A protein has these predicted regions:
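Phosphate-binding loop of NTP-binding sites
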Residues: 19-150, 154, 160-166, 331-335, ...
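C-terminal helical cap/extension that packs against the catalytic core
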Residues: 2, 8, 240, 265-270, ...
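N-terminal pre-Walker A segment at the start of P-loop NTPase domains
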Residues: 9-19
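Acidic, Mg2+-coordinating active-site environments of NTP-dependent enzymes
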Residues: 2-9, 112-235, 257, 263-264, ...
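Glycine-rich phosphate/pyrophosphate-binding beta-alpha loops
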Residues: 222-224, 240-250
């Protein structure tokens, strides 16, 4: 607001710093003139981004979103980090309301896109499930208008329908059954969809099958996403970077099928799912009912949303304990350690369940 504050020739006075950042990133992207693949969806964005970028890196000089810098600030920063040596950009796009993907697409101007899935995430901001479909579909809208191409899992009727609704949109449909020899270190059957997307993208862009298998097989998840860890006392399935009803349900279905492999019991540590608005109570009750279907499992619920939902149930599952916070559960675990258990740890990142790992 004060021109006198500009005291260095490297400083530029602008009316809107955020708008200037976004416009600068857009212009930089245009000058690079490279293919850019945008990835969005309710679940699996970051994992798919990591897999896809590793596969493409077997043939191209790739720059991909670091961490989860996937919003109106993170996407411009990602684009500006690309250099003249970059041959391919992979950009993750997150959103919690309609209009946000449209903005990000107008900045990154992707040529290709992947929607991993349409699930029940950020229901409050999107205004419900239909809003999620409409908001995430903004990526398809952009690509349909600009002559782009999407990669669509052939077994997903929602995404297939969304692609078909846009008559000018070119679509590359791919199977979600993994080809022989493709192995990965991701926990959960649901992750095969992310792997299948990476395989499809690699093949489309001419990456040799052997290099695809190597790239997928060498990727090991971190940051508490789909990690299986054997401690001195227990086996942990850590998936607590984020949680919404769709990802929570997928984790529970997978956990029910997990063999004990030397453990004597199963324990679920489930943290609140956030940003669900009016749908919160019903979604948390549904997750509790799914958890109760896992035979002989001990259920530990963390946070006020799960507590409210649990107390509203007419029939409450046995062997369930409520904890107001991660800190209270941590204190309990210090007093009464658990051992020889297969433990699922799943919840929204802000609940802080990853801090329990050292106690398990």
């Amino acid at each position: 607001d004060d021109p006198a504050a500009v005291t260095d020739e490297r400083m530029v006075l602008v009316g809107d710093t955020l708008g200037a950042l976004q416009e600068l990133a857009r212009e930089h992207r245009r000058r690079l003139a490279i293919p850019i693949l945008a990835i969005s969806g309710s679940n699996g964005k970051t994992t798919t981004k990591e897999l896809v970028s590793r596969v493409l890196a077997e043939r191209f000089e790739v720059y991909a979103t670091r961490g989860n810098l996937n919003n109106h600030i993170g996407v411009p920063l990602t684009l500006l980090a690309m250099t003249r040596d970059t041959q391919f950009g992979v950009v993750e796009m997150g959103a919690s309301a309609c209009g946000e993907i449209a903005l990000l697409a107008s900045i990154a101007e992707p040529n290709y896109g992947i929607l991993t899935n349409i699930g029940r995430a950020h229901l409050e901001g999107f205004g419900g499930p239909e809003g999620v479909r409409r908001g995430k579909g903004e990526l398809y809208d952009w690509l349909a208008r600009t002559g782009g191409r999407v990669f669509v899992p052939a077994n997903d009727p929602v995404l297939m329908s969304m692609a078909a609704e846009r008559e000018t949109l070119a679509a590359e449909c791919y199977p979600t059954t993994l080809a022989d020899g493709v192995e990965h270190h991701l926990e959960g059957d649901y992750n095969r969809f992310n792997v299948a997307a990476a395989v499809a993208v690699g093949r489309y862009f001419g990456v040799d099958d052997e290099r695809i298998r190597y790239a997928v097989g060498s990727y090991r998840p971190d940051n508490h996403r789909s990690q299986k860890i054997r401690t001195g006392q227990n086996t942990l399935i850590l998936d607590c970077y984020n949680a919404n009803p769709s990802s929570m349900q997928a984790s529970l279905v997978n956990f029910r099928q997990e063999p004990l492999e030397g453990c004597t019991r199963k324990i679920l540590i489930l943290g609140d799912m956030l940003e669900l608005g009016d749908w919160s109570d019903a979604e948390h009750r549904h997750i509790i009912s799914l958890a109760a279907e896992i035979p002989d499992a001990r259920i530990l619920l963390v946070g006020p949303h799960f507590a409210k939902a649990y107390r509203s149930l007419e029939s409450r599952p046995a062997d369930t304990t409520l904890y107001p916070s991660q800190e209270v559960l941590a204190a309990e675990l210090r007093k009464h350690p658990v051992s020889q258990a297969l433990i699922l740890v799943k919840g929204s990142h802000s609940i802080g369940l990853e801090r329990l790992a050292d106690l398990l």
